[in-house]
Amino acid sequence: MKSAVLVFPGINRERDMARALRLVSGREPAMVWHAETSLPEGTDLVVAPGGFSYGDYLRCGAIAARAPVMDAVRAFASDGGLVLGVCNGFQILCESGLLPGILMRNARLKFICHDVHLRVERSDTPFTRGYNAGQVIRVPVAHGEGNYAADEDTIRRLEGEGRVLYRYCSASGEVGDTHNINGAAQSIAGIVNERGNVLGMMPHPENHVEDIMGCTDGRGLFAGLVAHLERAA
């Protein structure tokens, strides 16, 4: 799997993401600066990592979404290329029009930084084939604006089309207000576009891929992408 990690001013999770990709795929990802106008030839996966691009001024991800490299990312996605946005990367994908909705301030107006449980809603997508449907995984979050919101029609469409891939839940898989850490509509933690090749999620799977971290639940996302691309080759 040949991956490319986008680097914007203020991003601070690009090295975490690059390490996870390298450990799981066995290949060193390319680091692509925001001012670039093209992606490396042969790229299979583009990742927008977490952090605080441009200091989160205006709106989280709003300035990064207008960076030169994003035209190449939109074209890549339009051609069916796989795109993953994590945390600030999710915000960037929403601001760039690659995903619907927006990420608002957490309901309790506080920064959240701890492990959470997610329920995997489907296992038949490139981003979830490393898991079983209904499986509960544990991954970290670190955000102040992770409260996913969209109009009622968009939420209805996301649910009806099976485009919610990850949902906040309890350790046993229960979904509800008690386990909804940030107030996100329908406890949404991660969604895909209509075509299913662009995923945005607030939690950080890249931080749970090694035994030394005490949990490897995030590894399945990356292993699933590798398996999907190998099968498609």
Curated annotation (Swiss-Prot):
Keywords: ATP-binding, Cytoplasm, Glutamine amidotransferase, Hydrolase, Ligase, Nucleotide-binding, Purine biosynthesis. It is found in: Cytoplasm. Gene3D superfamilies: 3.40.50.880. Residues 3-233 form the Glutamine amidotransferase type-1 domain. It holds the Pfam family GATase_5. It comes from the Bacteria. Its EC number is 6.3.5.3, 3.5.1.2. InterPro entries: Class_I_gatase-like, PRibForGlyAmidine_synth_PurQ. Pathway: Purine metabolism; IMP biosynthesis via de novo pathway; 5-amino-1-(5-phospho-D-ribosyl)imidazole from N(2)-formyl-N(1)-(5-phospho-D-ribosyl)glycinamide: step 1/2. It catalyses: N(2)-formyl-N(1)-(5-phospho-beta-D-ribosyl)glycinamide + L-glutamine + ATP + H2O = 2-formamido-N(1)-(5-O-phospho-beta-D-ribosyl)acetamidine + L-glutamate + ADP + phosphate + H(+); L-glutamine + H2O = L-glutamate + NH4(+). GO terms for cellular component: cytoplasm. One of its GO terms (biological process) is 'de novo' IMP biosynthetic process. GO terms for molecular function: ATP binding; glutaminase activity; phosphoribosylformylglycinamidine synthase activity. The active site is at 87 (nucleophile), 204, 206. NCBIfam families: FGAM_synth_I, PRK03619.1. This is Phosphoribosylformylglycinamidine synthase subunit PurQ. It comes from Nitrobacter winogradskyi (strain ATCC 25391 / DSM 10237 / CIP 104748 / NCIMB 11846 / Nb-255). The gene is purQ.
